[in-house]
């Protein structure tokens, strides 16, 4: 499966259903009155983390995802059915950004509400009053939220395997865990992070095999920096180093990887670390091991042969033991605080000599919610706009009979007594 760790997409909550206008028509029931039901709620969109997914590939080509709309209200005070919510499965460790601000960090086993659906509109039963026993008024359902998002995956693994190309990371992962990575005798066999679940005698944990690092990885060379970010949440860093091949220098390999980690993020050097000396089955292993111990006498080294699986079970238990004492680095990334901006209810913009536009979310939402389908609805909208000061502001702009006033998606023809829908 192709590894994709960053995608952009647009999510749209479902629209609420429209409220109904209807009246009781039953035998032996005089003056039955209104019985129009409310519209149903539009569907929300949730992200649900799944341990079985470790790529954003499924979302790469889903540029727009829409939740379902709520049903319209019906006669006999029947409410419209609320829409089913839309669940999108994502990998654990997915970061959700809107306008480059972090809004969610998917690290817990629960559903995350990302986009809300619209509310259902009221039916005419809700508008009944002592003064108006038969109202011809209703509401449209509101639109759902719309968000343009960037998703970035930072894999959640307990242990990160790092090393130079061809150090044996993929082979080790395949014998340690249930993972089946591609294995070859050439550099960069692993082109993307591979996750595996390891079960030791008394614990289980996840381990990630990161593509081989080369000098300059922290500056973007090779495959390095593209995947170094995936080690940021690992609690333990396990260096797998080739100690057996004649043309390899374990000391240089270790120092090179340390330097790339330091250049990328020096706090990575504070993590619990283990040296895994691989290729014990080769003849130069002991010589290289002795030289390494002299250079780094305080480092903990565990000897294995991933190819023959020698000491692999012992390594499983050792990693589990180290992990039980390691500090957690799975702190949730702090979300960016939302700045509350107080905006005007509306603003009048003169487009031409006889054309004006009223802009402002409160006003456009109001016009969207009140249908232009009955005289009473038109009067209700007119009164609300008047009470909010819209008409007074337009008069200041010398609006005249016959001029056009655009509000939201609608255009009204101005009349000194009342605006009528064009």
UniProtKB/Swiss-Prot annotation:
Cellular component GO terms held in the UniProt record: cytoplasm
Domain Obg intervals: 1-156
Keywords: Cytoplasm, GTP-binding, Hydrolase, Magnesium, Metal-binding, Nucleotide-binding
Record's subcellular location: Cytoplasm
Binding site for GTP: 163-170, 188-192, 209-212, 278-281, 305-307
Nucleotide-binding keyword on record: yes
Domain OBG-type G: 157-324
Location of the OCT domain: 338-416
Essential cofactor(s): Mg(2+)
Enzyme class: hydrolase
Family according to the record: Belongs to the TRAFAC class OBG-HflX-like GTPase superfamily. OBG GTPase family.
Record's protein name: GTPase Obg
Organism: Mycoplasma mobile (strain ATCC 43663 / 163K / NCTC 11711) (Mesomycoplasma mobile)
């Amino acid at each position: 499966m192709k590894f994709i760790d960053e995608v952009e997409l647009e999510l749209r909550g479902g629209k609420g259903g429209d409220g109904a206008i209807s009246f009781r028509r039953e035998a032996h029931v005089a003056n039955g009155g209104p019985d129009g039901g409310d519209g149903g709620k539009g569907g929300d969109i949730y992200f649900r983390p799944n341990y079985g997914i470790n790529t954003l590939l499924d979302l790469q080509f889903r540029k727009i995802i829409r939740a379902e709309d709520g049903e319209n209200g019906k006669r006999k005070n029947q409410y419209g059915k609320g829409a089913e919510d839309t669940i999108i499965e994502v990998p654990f460790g997915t970061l959700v950004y809107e306008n480059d601000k972090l809004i969610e960090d998917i690290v817990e086993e629960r559903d995350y509400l990302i986009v809300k659906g619209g509310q259902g509109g009221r039916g005419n039963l809700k508008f009944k009053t002592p003064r108006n026993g038969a109202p011809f008024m209703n509401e449209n359902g509101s639109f759902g939220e719309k968000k343009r998002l960037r998703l970035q995956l930072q894999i959640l693994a307990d242990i990160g395997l790092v090393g130079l190309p061809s150090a044996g990371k993929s082979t080790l992962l395949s014998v340690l865990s249930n993972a089946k990575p591609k294995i070859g005798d050439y550099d960069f066999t692993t082109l993307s992070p591979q996750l595996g679940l390891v079960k030791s005698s008394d614990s289980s944990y996840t381990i990630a095999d990161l593509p081989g690092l080369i000098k300059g990885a922290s500056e973007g060379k090779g495959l390095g920096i593209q995947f170094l970010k995936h080690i940021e949440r690992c609690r333990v860093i396990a260096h797998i180093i080739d100690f057996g091949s004649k043309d390899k220098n374990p000391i240089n390999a270790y120092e090179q990887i340390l330097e790339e980690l330091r250049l990328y993020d020096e706090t990575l050097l504070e993590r619990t670390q283990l040296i895994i000396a691989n290729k014990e089955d080769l003849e130069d292993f002991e010589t290289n091991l002795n030289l390494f111990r002299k250079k780094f006498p305080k480092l903990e080294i565990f000897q294995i042969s991933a190819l023959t699986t020698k000491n692999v079970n012992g390594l499983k238990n050792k990693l589990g033991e180290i992990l039980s004492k390691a500090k957690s680095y799975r702190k949730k990334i702090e979300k960016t605080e939302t700045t509350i901006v107080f905006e005007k209810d509306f603003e009048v913009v003169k487009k031409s000599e006889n054309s004006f536009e009223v802009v402002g979310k409160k006003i456009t939402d109001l016009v969207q919610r009140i249908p232009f389908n009955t005289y009473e609805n038109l009067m209700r909208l007119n009164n609300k706009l008047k009470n909010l000061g819209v008409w007074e502001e337009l008069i200041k702009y010398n609006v005249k009979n016959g001029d056009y006033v655009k509000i939201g998606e609608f255009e009204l023809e101005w009349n000194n007594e009342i605006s009528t829908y064009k």
